[in-house]
């Protein structure tokens, strides 16, 4: 039993160490959470984007085919906030909610860092929505309902 606990602990350390971020890695980044809703052909694409360049950051929400921006918010984040955000985004991509068995709902996500390292997923990144609520100062679903 002790060997199993030690193995799990070491595996977790290696998992966290693999994604150790340097400040230059997240100086500039862009994250997209795209959702395809196959039951509504006129507006079947929805996209959230969070991007930062230095301390300047922007959140956009786009709807439609082709995508058209309906909501935009600009904000500033310090280095510690950006590091926390990027770390949570990576965690969420790796552990996102899987909808592969669902035919009418298809989420995908993509994170691009300053060092050109990319993370991709075909899951709903629940960590992203927690971050989004915090940065928006309201629940993201309120914005979805408006558009």
Model-derived segments and spans:
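Positively charged n-region of N-terminal signal peptides that target proteins for export
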Residues: 1-4
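A short, structured loop/turn motif at beta-sheet edges
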Residues: 53, 76-84, 113-117
């Amino acid at each position: 039993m002790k060997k199993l606990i030690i193995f799990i602990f070491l595996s977790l350390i290696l998992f966290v160490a693999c994604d150790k971020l340097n400040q230059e890695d997240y100086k500039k980044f862009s994250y997209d959470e795209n959702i395809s809703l196959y039951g509504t052909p006129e507006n079947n694409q929805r996209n959230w984007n969070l991007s930062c360049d230095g301390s300047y950051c922007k959140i956009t929400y786009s709807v439609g085919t082709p995508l058209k921006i309906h909501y935009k918010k600009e904000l500033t984040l310090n280095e510690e906030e950006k590091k926390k955000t990027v770390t949570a985004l990576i965690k969420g991509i790796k552990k996102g909610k899987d909808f592969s068995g669902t035919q009418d709902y298809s989420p995908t996500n993509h994170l691009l860092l300053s060092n050109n390292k990319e993370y991709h997923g075909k899951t709903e990144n629940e960590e992203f929505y927690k971050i989004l609520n915090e940065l928006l100062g309201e629940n993201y679903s309120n914005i979805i309902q408006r558009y």
